[in-house]
Regions:
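Helical scaffold of the NTase/Pol beta-like nucleotidyltransferase catalytic core
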Residues: 1-26, 154-166
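Short, acidic/polar N-cap/turn motifs at the starts of alpha helices
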Residues: 14, 75-78, 117-120
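Active-site nucleotide-donor binding segment shared across nucleotidyl transfer reactions
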Residues: 14-46, 51, 57, 132
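Anion (oxyanion) recognition and catalysis
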Residues: 18, 63, 122
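Short, solvent-exposed loop/turn segments at secondary-structure junctions
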Residues: 31-32, 95-96, 135-137
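Short amphipathic alpha-helices in soluble, non-transmembrane regions
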Residues: 58-64
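Conserved catalytic core of two-metal-ion nucleotidyltransferases
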Residues: 67-101
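Catalytic cores of NTP-dependent nucleotidyl/adenyl transfer enzymes across multiple folds
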Residues: 103-166
Length: 166
């Protein structure tokens, strides 16, 4: 099993998602790197937040590429793995007309997500939907941060401080 999701895999997943015509945003470590405009570290997986109405269609597309479900915590998240492409962690959202969204939490409640948290950034010449710089901190809560999460937040803090000086 491939233990990292590299830049080529990210491009392949982005092409798949773009071809589906659904709303999605890259989250997690790759989401931070997209905001930074550079890859700062290796990534275990690609986190994808998406319009939950496409859950079955997205799962079929991923399974058709050879991914298999390894963790199924529906409706919160589904993790899939591929022997050559690594891991992808998909998070179905319920998207409101105003652009805000909700994600089911594991205890049966909901996380409420503000419309302005959904953004995009340019990474290697490609405009990619992602969770905004300001929303990355709330998205990195609710669990014990790993060392890579702490580094991601430090990199994001440095990036945001640089933006304040522009």
């Amino acid at each position: 099993m491939k233990e990292t999701a590299d830049r080529e895999t990210l491009e392949e997943i982005l092409d798949l998602l773009d071809g589906m015509g659904m709303r999605y945003w890259i989250d997690g470590g790759w989401g931070v790197d997209i905001i930074l405009g550079r890859q700062s570290r290796e990534h275990r997986d690609i986190d994808v937040d998406f319009d939950g109405e496409y859950t079955d269609v997205l799962l079929k597309a991923l399974e058709d590429k050879g991914y298999v479900i390894t963790t199924d915590w529906r409706p919160c998240r589904i993790e899939l793995s591929h022997p050559l492409l690594g891991y992808i962690d998909i998070h179905p959202f319920v998207i409101a007309e105003d652009g805000s969204a909700r994600q089911a939490d594991p205890e049966g409640g909901w996380y409420d997500l503000q419309a302005e948290w959904f953004s995009s950034a340019v990474f290697e010449g490609r405009k990619i939907p992602c969770i905004s710089a300001g929303a990355q901190k709330p998205f990195h809560t609710g669990y014990e941060p790993r060392e890579v999460d702490k580094v991601d937040m430090q990199n994001l803090d440095a990036f945001l401080k640089g933006q304040d000086k522009l």
